Swiss-Prot record:
Domain Radical SAM core, chain residue ranges per copy: 140-369
Protein name: Ribosomal protein uS12 methylthiotransferase RimO
Protein function: Catalyzes the methylthiolation of an aspartic acid residue of ribosomal protein uS12.
Cofactor remark: Binds 2 [4Fe-4S] clusters. One cluster is coordinated with 3 cysteines and an exchangeable S-adenosyl-L-methionine.
UniProt catalytic activity: L-aspartate(89)-[ribosomal protein uS12]-hydrogen + (sulfur carrier)-SH + AH2 + 2 S-adenosyl-L-methionine = 3-methylsulfanyl-L-aspartate(89)-[ribosomal protein uS12]-hydrogen + (sulfur carrier)-H + 5'-deoxyadenosine + L-methionine + A + S-adenosyl-L-homocysteine + 2 H(+)
Keyword set includes Translocase: no
Lineage: Bacteria, Bacillati, Bacillota, Clostridia, Thermoanaerobacterales
Residues holding [4Fe-4S] cluster 1: 11, 47, 80
Cellular component per GO, a single term: cytosol
One GO process term, biological-process aspect: tRNA modification
Organism of derivation: Caldanaerobacter subterraneus subsp. tengcongensis (strain DSM 15242 / JCM 11007 / NBRC 100824 / MB4)
Length: 436
């Protein structure tokens, strides 16, 4: 009864929670297994951000429930789906023995002890707790990179987003605690630190009454073993001149930013309640572009309620004009409990998918042209693996799992975690080929 497996779905922020649960379980003598068939207990850390994520979470619960016919004794759901559907989830999915919300995952050991006694456990309704400080992590990423969560929750009130209800209001972690965790990760061999939160750029606003991300980055860059610091989930309205200067002048911060913009049309931004304007977005992009070698990733949403052909055309032209190196396009997901749920008219699924496809076609060409422009240049690559006779890794331009890869041809023996400087010799739509 000591084998536990965790399946972590959704975003990297969820992965960090899973890593903390793993550490708590290991501390109490549980064996962590990667093969679900060998597990006595399976924990599914769920996502419920959009419809597809909910479906995936439910499919995993049903699929893992099948294992109860064999070795598996207990099945537990944690994370956003649990927080959102709590009682309904445990009622509709009888294979679940426990449902734990986002603020209660630190009680995982006690919950397992409870279900062993034959009880069904339901814990939710505390998303505002920030009670996981000081809990170690068992990394589920390769040893050379790790995510560093600097805040929990979100106080932005975007009309399409359920996250504030599932994760509570914005809560920055104390800077000294973040630094301590980063030092510990670096001691364990982490070379790339990826900064995450629902909104990284709001860091400090609640705790220190001012935006403190530039200072935090400055402190993190003093950690000797770290080579790359990467920033994800930046919001345009909080990208200050001070932050831009820090990114520009700090050698350890990679010249890459993930800045979800969602739309370009003033009227759509207003309906989305994004708290920013087209002018502000244009200003921020222009300032970020002043940083040599800057690579920008963004995400856009199509099919938001009431999105007209004109508003969509505006977005198309914006993408063509700004030529972002990395773009993700989502179709709007109508979520109960959000303001946009009641907005009219809702856009037909067929139209949403067509718009998504159109944008991705435009972006594919932009990405290809950008990659082609890299042929003949030198790039530093973090090696991640070897397959079919070639190494592969990422350059500063690529965040793990969401961006492309650099394939590296080399006669030398290379290892995951090595940094090598390659000459780019070929390019595809999303990947590069280099020689070393």
């Amino acid at each position: 009864m000591r084998n536990v497996g965790i399946i972590s779905l959704g975003c990297p922020k969820n992965s960090v929670d899973s890593e903390k649960m793993l550490a708590l379980l290991k501390e109490k003598g549980y064996n962590i297994v990667n093969d679900e068939k060998k597990a006595d207990v399976i924990i599914i850390n769920t996502c419920a951000f959009i419809e597809d994520a909910k479906k995936e979470s439910i499919e995993y619960i049903i699929q893992m429930g099948e294992l109860k016919k064999k070795r598996l004794k207990y099945l537990i759901a944690t994370g956003c789906l649990s927080e959102r559907y709590n009682k309904e989830l445990i009622k509709e999915l009888p294979e679940l023995d426990a449902v734990i919300g986002t603020g209660d995952f630190t009680q995982i050991v006690d919950v397992i002890e409870e279900v062993k006694k034959g009880k069904k456990v339901l814990k939710y309704g505390h998303p505002d707790l920030l009670n996981d400080e000081g809990i170690p992590r068992i990394l589920t990423t390769p040893p050379y990179y790790a995510y560093l969560k600097i805040a929990e929750g979100c106080s932005n009130a975007c009309s399409f987003c359920i996250i504030p209800k599932l994760r509570g209001k914005y809560k920055s972690r104390k800077m000294e605690n973040i630094i301590e965790e980063a030092q510990e990760l670096a001691r364990k061999g982490v070379k790339e630190l990826i900064i995450i939160a629902q909104d990284t750029t709001k860091y400090g606003i609640d705790l220190y009454k001012k935006l403190m991300l530039p200072q935090l980055l400055r402190e993190l860059s003093k950690i000797e073993e770290l080579k790359w610091i990467r920033l994800l989930y930046a919001y345009p309205d909080s990208v200050t001149d001070e932050l831009i200067e820090e990114i520009k002048n700090n050698q350890k911060i990679v010249k890459y930013i993930d800045i979800p913009l969602q739309h370009s049309s003033e009227s759509v931004l207003k309906r989305m309640n994004r708290g920013t304007t087209r002018r502000k977005i244009e200003e921020v992009i222009s300032k970020l572009r002043s940083i040599p070698g800057m690579v920008m990733r963004t995400t856009f949403m199509v099919g938001f309620p009431g999105e007209t052909e004109e508003e969509f055309e505006d977005l198309k032209n914006f993408i063509k004009e700004k030529r972002f190196e990395r773009v993700g396009v989502f179709t709007y997901s109508r979520e109960e409990g959000t303001k946009s749920y009641y907005m009219k008219p809702q856009i037909r699924k067929k139209v949403k998918l067509k718009r998504q496809e159109e944008l991705m076609e435009i972006q594919k060409q932009i990405s290809y042209e950008f990659n082609m422009s890299k042929i003949g240049t030198k790039l530093e690559v973090l090696i991640e693996g070897f397959e079919d006779g070639v190494y592969y890794g990422r350059s500063y331009m690529d965040a793990p799992e969401i961006d492309g890869l650099v394939y590296v041809r080399s006669d030398k023996k290379l290892f995951p975690g090595d940094f090598v400087t390659v000459t780019v010799v070929d390019a595809f739509e999303y990947d590069l080929v280099g020689e070393y």
